[in-house]
Amino acid sequence: MILSARLSVAYGKIPNLHLRLLDAKNTSTELDSRLNILKGEKVKNMRDKWWQDAVIYQVYPKSFNDTTGSGYGDITGIIEKLPYLEKLGVDGLWLSPVYLSPQVDNGYDITDYRVIDTMFGSNEDMYRLIEAAHDKNIKIIMDFVANHTSDQCVWFQESRKGTDNFFSDFYIWQDAKPDGSEPNNWGSSFGGSAWTWDEKREQYYLHYYAAEQPDLNWENPHVRAYIYDMMRFWKQKGVDGWRMDVITSISKDQDFPDNARDLTTTNQQNGPRMHEFIHEMNQEILTPLDMMTVGESPAAKSWDAWELVSPEREELDMIFTFEHMHIDRKAGDVNGRWALQDRDLVKLKDILSNWQLELRDKGWNALYFENHDRARVISRWGNDTTYRYECATAFATILHGLQGTPFIYQGEEIGMTNPEFELGEYVDIELKGNYQHFVVEQQTMTQADFLAAVHKISRDNARTPMQWDDSENAGFTNGTPWFKVNPNYPDINVAKDLKAEKSVFKYYQELIRLRKTEDILKTGTYKLLLPEDEAIFAYLRQNGSKTWLVLANLSENMIKLEELMPLPDVKATVITNYRDRTNLSETLRAYEAVIVEI
C-alpha cells in the first residue's frame, strides 16, 4: 500500500517544494500500473539482475570534466566523456550529488532533490545524460541522501518557524537541558556536538554531520512519503538505481540516551526502526519500480550484512561496508579515524574473505577500494611511485577477482595518487572540523601528525580534478579549478596512460572483459590461501571443473611462492601485470599479480 501523505497545508502555499503530495486515493494511473507489475512478487533468484554482471564507475561531477570554464565539472562534461567510459567497458555510472545545494559538504547538503544545481547545468542536461548513457548501454545511478538535507532546504526553513506547522516535525528537535546544554552527548562525524541551538525555534536540532546538514525525522510518515515521491520522480526520468548515503543512520533511538564517551558517534548506525524503514522503501519504490540499490552501511559486518541484502528480507541489493577500510586504523583511539598504523594485510584478507563466504547465496557484495570518501589505495596501502603501475593493477586484480559488483572510482583506472598538499590547501569540511576538534580543542594530535594522516586518508585525496592530459589543469578546465590539481598530472593522465606500454587503463579493460565473459567470477566458490602471510593475497575461485588461482604480492619484496605453498600445474595464464610471467615457480616480484587456471 502506498504511504498516505494527507497534508494539512496546501502545496501551493509552500514555495519551491517541487514535490507532488501523495495520497493513496489520487495516485496517478501511470504509477498504479507500475506498482502492479511486481505486486506481491518476491525476488528470490540471485542470478538474474543486471548489476550482478556489471562493473560500475563512480563520477564525482565537481572534479570530472568542466566544459564551461567555471572551474567546476558539469553534466555536459560527463556526456562528453561517455565514449571514454564506453571504451573502458563499464555498465553503470554512479553520480555523486548534482542536486541544488549550497555545497557546504560538496553536494551532500541538498536544498531541492528535484532540481539540478546550476553549477552542473540544468535538469534538461541531466535528462540528456540519462538518454545518452542509455544509448551506450550504461545505467545511471544517482546518489540518494535521505538522512539529512541542507539547512537551506525549505522544509528546514519552515520547521524552524515553530512547533505547530506541517514541517515542524520534519527534523529532530529537542529541548535544552535545564542548564541550557545539549540534549545528550552525541558527537558529529565532522567534530564537536551533533546538536546545534536554533535561536528562532529555541530548541536544539540534530545533525550527524555538519550543522548545515540537519537530520530528517524518519519517524514522521510525511517525510518518508516526500522522499519516496522524489524517487518516483527520478525513476520516471530514467534513473536506474540509487547509491544510498549513510542509509543505516536514518533511524534514531527516540530515548536519545548518552553514549559511553562524550562527542562520539557510536549511536549513529542501525537504529531501532532502520530495517522497518528500509523494507517499507523497498515495498513502496524499489521492488515495484525495479531500482538497483547499494547502501552505505558503515557499521555492517559480514555476519549481519545479510539482514540488509538477503532477497528474502526485501531491503537493499548491496551495501558498502567500511570494515575493510579500517585495516590501517588504531582501534579505539581517541583520535578516531585519524589515528593510523601500518596496513594489516592479514586483517584485510580475513575481512574480505568473511564477506565472500557469509554472503554467498544469501546476498551480493559491493566491491571497492576507492570512492569520493576514500584516499587513493596505492598511496594509502601501497607504492605510488616506483611501482605505481604494478601496485594499481595488483590491487585491482585482487578486487575484481572476487564475487560481487566492482566499483571503480574516477582516476582509479589510470592509477591516480594522493596529492600531499599543505594543510591550508585542503577544502573538505570534515577535515577542517576534525582539525579543530582534535588539534585545536582536544590537543590530542599535533598539527604534523594530523597532516600526515591527511596525506594518507583525507577525503580530499580522491577529489582532486580528473587528470585527462598534460595540458594546463590536466585538461579538466580552461578556468581556475575549484580545487587544486595534483601536480603530478604531466606524468599521470588519461592520454599518457592510453599510450603507455604499461597501461593501468588497459589492464582494467581486460579485468572488465573477464567479468563479462567468465562465469566463474560471478558464480564460482571462494577459498582463501595463505591466510597468515603478510605480503601475499591468494585465493581460489572454482566453478564446476574450472579452477582459478588469483594471486598478488602486495609488497616490494621478492617472494618465492614455492616456499609458501605447493605449486599447482598451470593450464593457462588468464591475466598478469608482468607480461613475462609464464609459470608459478619463478620469484614473485614487487606488486606482481596473476590469475591462472589450474
State where each predicted segment sits.
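Acidic/aromatic-lined carbohydrate-recognition and catalytic surfaces
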Residues: 44-232, 236, 249-301, 308-311, ...
